C-alpha cells in the first residue's frame, strides 16, 4: 500500500510540474509576442509532404499591426493577397480574378495568425505551449484530428524569425522571416482592400 501511495505521489508531482512548465512557457511566448506592435518582413515559404518531399515554394511580404491587422502578399510564383483590417479578411487572387471575404475571427482560428496578430486571453487558453530548446511548440488543447500544431522561433533581437505549421496528417509549411526596418508609417488604408472592378466576389461573412 505504501509503495502505491509513493508511486501516485511521484506521478502527481510529475503531472503538476509539467502543467506549471507549460503555463510558464505559454506566458513566456505571450510576452515575446507582446513585445512588438508590428512586423514588417519579407518571407519565404516552403511546403513539404509528411515524407519530406518539397511540394511548393513561395516568397512575399508580411506586415502585421497588432491587434488584428495584417497584410500577406505572395509575390512569387503566383501573386496572391490576404488583407485584414481587424474585422474582415479579404483573400484576393488576381489570376482567377476572385476575392473572398471572411470574418477575421473565423478565418484565423487554428492558424498562427491568431497568436501573431494579438490573441486575447480566452484564445490563449485554447493552446498548450512547450518550450524545447529555442522553439516554442504550440498545440490545441482540444486535440481534434483536424488540429494543426505550430512552432515559433525568435532571433537574437526577440523577433519572430520562423514559424512552422504542421497539419494533423503531417504536411509541413515553414515560413522564414527577414525583418525590414519600417522607414515610415504605413499609408492610410494599407490594411484595407478595395475590390477591383469586374472581380468575382465570394462573401462568406
Curated annotation (Swiss-Prot):
Naturally occurring in which organism (per UniProt): Psychromonas ingrahamii (strain DSM 17664 / CCUG 51855 / 37)
Subunit structure comment from the entry: Monomer.
Protein transport keyword on record: yes
Chief place of localization: periplasm
One record GO biological process: lipoprotein localization to outer membrane
Pfam families in UniProt: LolA
Family classification: Belongs to the LolA family.
Signal peptide start-end: 1-22
Coiled-coil stretches: none
Keywords, in A-Z order: Chaperone, Periplasm, Protein transport, Signal, Transport
Record's function text: Participates in the translocation of lipoproteins from the inner membrane to the outer membrane. Only forms a complex with a lipoprotein if the residue after the N-terminal Cys is not an aspartate (The Asp acts as a targeting signal to indicate that the lipoprotein should stay in the inner membrane).
Localization, UniProt: Periplasm
Matching InterPro entries: LolA/LolB/LppX, OM_lipoprot_carrier_LolA-like, OM_lipoprot_carrier_LolA_Pbac
A single Gene Ontology CC term: outer membrane-bounded periplasmic space
Protein name: Outer-membrane lipoprotein carrier protein
Aminoacyl-tRNA synthetase keyword on record: no
Amino acid at each position: 500500500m505504501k509503495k502505491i501511495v509513493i508511486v501516485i505521489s511521484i506521478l502527481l508531482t510529475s503531472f503538476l510540474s509539467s502543467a506549471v512548465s507549460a503555463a510558464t512557457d505559454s506566458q513566456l511566448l505571450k510576452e515575446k509576442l507582446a513585445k512588438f506592435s508590428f512586423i514588417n518582413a519579407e518571407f519565404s515559404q516552403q511546403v513539404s509532404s509528411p515524407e519530406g518531399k518539397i511540394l511548393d515554394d513561395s516568397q512575399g511580404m508580411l506586415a502585421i499591426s497588432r491587434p488584428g491587422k495584417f497584410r500577406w502578399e505572395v509575390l512569387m510564383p503566383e501573386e496572391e493577397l490576404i488583407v485584414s483590417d481587424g474585422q474582415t479578411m479579404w483573400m484576393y487572387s488576381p489570376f482567377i480574378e476572385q476575392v473572398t471575404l471572411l470574418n477575421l475571427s473565423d478565418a484565423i482560428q487554428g492558424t498562427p495568425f491568431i497568436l501573431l496578430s494579438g490573441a486575447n486571453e480566452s484564445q490563449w487558453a485554447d493552446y498548450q505551449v512547450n518550450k524545447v530548446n529555442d522553439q516554442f511548440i504550440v498545440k490545441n488543447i482540444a486535440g481534434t484530428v483536424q488540429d494543426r500544431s505550430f512552432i515559433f522561433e525568435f532571433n537574437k533581437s526577440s523577433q519572430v524569425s520562423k514559424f512552422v505549421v504542421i497539419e494533423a496528417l503531417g504536411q509541413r509549411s515553414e515560413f522564414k522571416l527577414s525583418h525590414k526596418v519600417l522607414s515610415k508609417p504605413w499609408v492610410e488604408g494599407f490594411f484595407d482592400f478595395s475590390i477591383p472592378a469586374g472581380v468575382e466576389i465570394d462573401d462568406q461573412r
